[in-house]
Amino acid sequence: MGNPKAFLNIPRQEAGYRPIHERISDFGEVEQTLNSSERKLQASRCMDCGVPFCHWACPLGNRPPEFQDALSNGKWREAYEILTRTNDFPEFTGRVCPALCEKSCVLKLSIDSPVTIREDEAAIIEAAFREGYITAKQYKRNGLKVAVIGSGPAGLAAANQLNRRGYQVTVFEKDEYIGGLLRFGIPNFKLHKPVIDRRLKIMEDEGICFKTNSTIDLEHLPEGFDAYAICTGTPEARNLNIPGRELRGIHFAMEILAQQNRVLAGQTFSDEERITAKNKKVLVIGGGDTGSDCIGTANRQGAISVCQIEIMPKPPVGHNPATPWPQWPVVLKTSSSHEEGCTRRWSLTSNRFLGTEDGRVCGVEVEEVEWIPAADGGRPQMRPTGKKEIIEADLVLLAMGFLKPQLPGLPQNAVVAGDAATGPSLVVKCIAAGRRAAAEIDAMLQKGSH
């Protein structure tokens, strides 16, 4: 802790986003970066608290006070080494993590100005790549083989940890590229795909084998492996089964997001296959991060208008007494995509889709709802109000979350990790789950070898 009063004298400075008029014309990453000296100043704001709630809040158990201290003193390599003891892929979390740590920072409580932990993390790992700190290493092999099914953040973390422990790791991916959610679920304007490829090259050089276009039947796992890490994610989206669902122009969010990422990777689609918001009135049903990603994608594709509706009530602004510090605050969040242009509405349920004579969607009948608090403090009860209206839309994107998969019975040497085990969560939680799965497999196989 170089300057114990830095948090009093140095204000929080975020790198911010590229100008809206510039960024909506491309799919480049929207977030900017600070220079090295500014980043060191931001790191110096960390107070090295006696009880580091930032560490408590991080699913990975990252140690922000330690890497912030190194960074503030210009020890970039040391900061990188501290960071990667607990996080396999800071370049992913540094871009897309909601920064649970920052909401639990003591400076968030005291002056509502937490340390820029996520941005500092991203700066550290990018400096490590730039300076050549990250090179492929070779690990002594133990003669055992592990198959990882799925190449999202949980699968990649499990593979990375198992490989470092000496196992011969093969990763099976059903799609044509490695990355899972990182590759196809997160827009390029949040996570540039060469960032993934850069990491995959290192993992391949370290001995991990990747097999794409490999759909694995979990009831018939591939033979020849001593253990399996099942990291297949949550591929099934929550549907909206109301009248008119069969109309053309209604798509799951992942359909447009994955297709747009494939287009940016050079894949072509026929006019009939292509899902585009160009010159359309877009309605996004669902108020979470996936819905936000749909908004950003629709605006970049040239939508006439974008409206996002959410069945839940509008969250409080700034502070919510129901989720006090150091908990994750359930408050109104405005993403970079929201800033780019959309109408947001809450407490609306969808009753039916309306269509044209030729079978295309042209609107949605919605109804205002009220949420009645439960007497026992549990989930509030939804009550329709009878106030109905039509929202015009010729492209409807369903972003209402994903369903936890129902997995078949698995052999004792199989460990399930990530969203496949818990249902939909965060990239940071999936990386943590992949690391735990690797440790569990290692303990199981080492016990069996004695």
Q: Residue locations for each model-derived region?
A:
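Residues forming the flavin
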Residues: 1-37, 42, 121-450
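Residues at helix-coil transition
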Residues: 72-73, 85, 422, 446
